[in-house]
Amino acid sequence: QRAHRLTSVAEGWAKESASRPLRAATRATKAAVAPLIKVNWNQSGSYKKYCPKDGNGQAIVGCVAVGMAQAMSVAQWPKRPSGEFGYDSKTYGYQYINYDKEPAYNWDAILSGANGNDDVARLLWHCGVAVRMNYGVDGSGTQDSYIATALPRNFGYQDSTVKYVPRQSYPDAQSTHLGYGE
């Protein structure tokens, strides 16, 4: 019955549009934007090198940390992390980094994957701790909203330039065009 209703609606629209002359588009189309993120990292293998481990194995990175680091790769920022941060992880206990004691980021090596992705793995670990990653061998997770506080706190981004916008806050048509205004 639902299929019948959908067919009826589609037929009605087809008849309606056939009876009207075609009009030129009133809005200019948006220019195509090439992908901004040029890297393709994942959560396992050499990328998890600095993640915590125990007798059950080594935790994977977590998609929030990967996404955050990939976004940071576009600006190749910061030159170095700063501050310190720690939290209690459910699985691996207290996780802490004194970012001030960490070396500067080598963005050329990060973007090229040189050094066996060691620089990438360190960046991913930094991001994971900064967003309170709940590390696990089979899956690591956290709230993506934590990115908005981690970027200014440990990575030198201005508070005014970081904004958390949940995808579900916008209808599909509107969310498609969010990036054009940035």
Name each model-derived stretch.
Residues Q1-D159:
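Active-site-adjacent structural elements in enzyme catalytic domains
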